[in-house]
A protein has these predicted regions:
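S-adenosylmethionine
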Residues: 1-225
Length: 225
């Protein structure tokens, strides 16, 4: 991070933030309750030691629960996800714990049977979370204007397997005709990507104040539409 960025983050103790961004990110997943019975899975012993094999998911060494996510689990080690049949079967989704916080924000909202619009949905992590919350009587419209990213979104939705998600590729303004039809509208708008700093070293070099301003303008446009 630049000196200017550290200054801008002084309220959050810029030096500590920089150190956190340099640290190895924890590995977390969100279990698919329709395929795993997530509520019955162990969250790891009190000592924080991993559970080598957890309720039919042998590739996952579960270290503990994500506090704000019913189905979220931290892993003690990062497995080879691409070699795990359970990953490809949609038994879980690899998702940062911070991204799972949206489920906590919806705890006071009646989501069972709800109609939910995920306006900027790819790659689908939050979409699958909404699908689990909405249940079989609900509907999630997962929208992504980029067709390449929408293809990835559709693949992840198919793997999750809840059968209550429709993938669309509309401009936000096209969905404006459905005013007051959705019970929940979620907008994970395009952002400047600081959250990628820990995972992708190239992300730091691609960051710029110009990109931040461009993203802010796009966010404002999406909300107005």
């Amino acid at each position: 991070m630049s000196r200017g960025q550290t200054r801008d983050f002084r309220f959050f103790k810029g030096a500590a933030l920089c150190a956190a961004l340099d640290a190895e990110p924890p590995v977390s997943v969100r279990l698919n309750p329709a395929k795993t019975g997530a509520d019955t899975l162990p969250a790891g012993p009190d000592a924080g030691l991993p559970v080598p094999e957890a309720a039919g998911l042998p590739a996952l060494a579960i270290a503990g629960r994500v506090p704000w996510s019913r189905d979220g689990r931290y892993l003690a080690v990062r497995p080879s996800f691409t070699l795990d049949p359970d990953f490809h079967a949609g038994a879980y989704y690899v998702q940062e714990a911070s991204s799972q916080f949206v489920g906590h924000l919806l705890e006071g909202v009646r989501t069972e049977g709800a109609r939910i619009l995920d306006l900027c949905a790819a790659p689908g992590g939050k979409t699958t979370l909404y699908a689990s919350l909405a249940g079989p009587d609900g509907l999630v419209v997962a929208n992504e204007i980029d067709r390449r990213r929408a293809s990835v979104l559709a693949d992840n939705v198919r793997k999750w397997g809840t059968g209550n998600v429709a993938v669309t590729t509309c401009e936000p303004r096209a969905l404006g005709d459905f005013e007051a039809w959705f019970d929940v509208v979620a907008v994970d708008a395009p952002c400047s990507g600081e959250g990628m700093f820990r995972k992708d070293p190239d992300a730091r070099g691609e960051w710029s104040e110009g990109n931040v301003k461009q993203c802010a303008a796009r966010q404002d446009e999406i909300l107005r539409e």
